[in-house]
Amino acid sequence: GTLLLLLSEALALTETWAGSHSLKYFHTSVSRPGRGEPRFISVGYVDDTQFVRFDNDAASPRMVPRAQWMEQEGPEYWDRETRSARDTAQTFRVNLRTLRGYYNQTEAGSHTLQWMHGCDLGPDGRFLRGYEQFAYDGKDYLTLNEDLRSWTAVDTAAQISERKSNDACEAEHQRAYLEDTCVEWLRKYLEKGKETLLHLDPPKTHVTHHRISDHEATLRCWALGFYPAEITLTWQRDGEDQNQYTELVETRPAGDGTFQKWAAVVVPSGEEQRYTCHVQHEGLPEPLTLRWEPASQTTIPIVGIFAGLVLLGAVVTGATVVAAVMWRKKSSGGKGGSYSKAEWSDSAQGSESLTACKA
């Protein structure tokens, strides 16, 4: 009876959470010499959906919901997450000063510190992988290795942080967080937001033709309105992949919870029908194969789509300058919450050290 119950629960879990899922946090701090405290923004994502955000430039800086399914959380949750975000902002402020000293930089320039961390669940609902990474001024600084037991430093300055991190048992602390706490909260969020997070929207696809000259044309394969964001677009010529000749844009949010992407190839005029676009997405029962259909060629929707993507690019740039340059961060501590405490904390003497492991 017990075995049957366990099997049925495992089956239900697999059916509910088909595919892998992730919980990720991104924290970014940008110093503003002569203009007060550094700007600090923190965002959390479940899969491709932003669900929380903190901005210390807000009129009343607090962690706030960014997804409707998070609005049901009570005040204790938001108070706890706000305290964690404020603690991280303070730690980042100190670390920016420390790193400026490591790199012998003056106080005049603006500098950026970023922190990303998170965990993935496999299709079976169990821990798949964890990750944590720091960057300074847009370059990798310190990365938690795949074994979650040690760090990789990119230069001499980062090696100082690495030694202090290892001395403070921070990797051990982070491994426990990533394998346990992060996974626990990811499961909770998937349950809370399952109607939004676990739905599938297959891509709407078509191929457009753009004449370059009398001898060449561009074929562009469009995928619109899909969720989740993971998708594969591949061009083939006579059945052979054309990856090295394909222009592929990054997947872009459409602003309505779905995503957009296109892939393009330049082809000799008159040979368009030798090229096929292949689309793979979780929402499709089977991969799609598309060709350019001259009879259906229209320009009005293409212009509209292109204009929308250009506008989207501007919007996304503003929204993700923080999130894209940095990475996703931690979740909650042992008492709950989804947000974990920040990395380094310098002493009053200016020495940098990670939080020591508790006995």
UniProtKB/Swiss-Prot annotation:
Q: Which Gene3D superfamilies match?
A: Immunoglobulins, MHC class I-like antigen recognition-like
Q: TM spans, by residue?
A: 303-326
A GO term from the CC aspect: early endosome membrane
Extracellular side of membrane: 19-302
> Which portions of the sequence form the region Connecting peptide?
293-302
Describe the location of the Ig-like C1-type domain by residue ranges. Answer: 203-291
Per its database record, what is this protein's job? Involved in the presentation of foreign antigens to the immune system.
Give the protein name, as stated in the record.
Answer: Popy class I histocompatibility antigen, alpha chain E
Source species: Pongo pygmaeus
